[in-house]
Amino acid sequence: MLFRSHEKLWAKRSWLIGPPLSFAHGVSLHALGMVTNGVFDRHPKLQIVLGHLGEHIPFDMWRINHWFEDIKKPLGLSCKSTIREYFARNLWITTSGHFSTPTLKYCMEEVGADRILFSIDYPFENFSDACTWYDGLTIDEGDKRKIGKDNAKKLFKLPAYHQSED
């Protein structure tokens, strides 16, 4: 019965089942599962990168944190910190496939420019759209540099490099 109602609901909207909704929900559930099961508490150096500006998690940050703090202790969840603390220590987000300046600014408020990486989402998005959007961003230049390169250098422990003249 559930399958039939699912088919009826999504039959004319099958394009929503993939990247726009289903992928984000699945990744969000896995990431939050890692948090609530104490994975980052047991492995504090573990770093996870979530694409698409955090797969909706930053937009539910207050609600998730509210439930973690008010409900987690009675449920006996393994996590020891708040969702915001895990984002500050273990979770990163990318701009991949999400070239919206207001959305980026919101994510900067929620997780901080120090935890965001510029990314494109190729082959689903093209370099031209991503780079045109990024080059035209009207945000603090220091934050733009962090998102564009400094955060990746830090996360991936990249050595110093020589800027090409091209």
Per-segment meaning from a language model:
Residues 37-38, 46, 79-80, 92-94, ...:
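Mid-to-C-terminal alpha-helical segments outside catalytic/metal-binding sites
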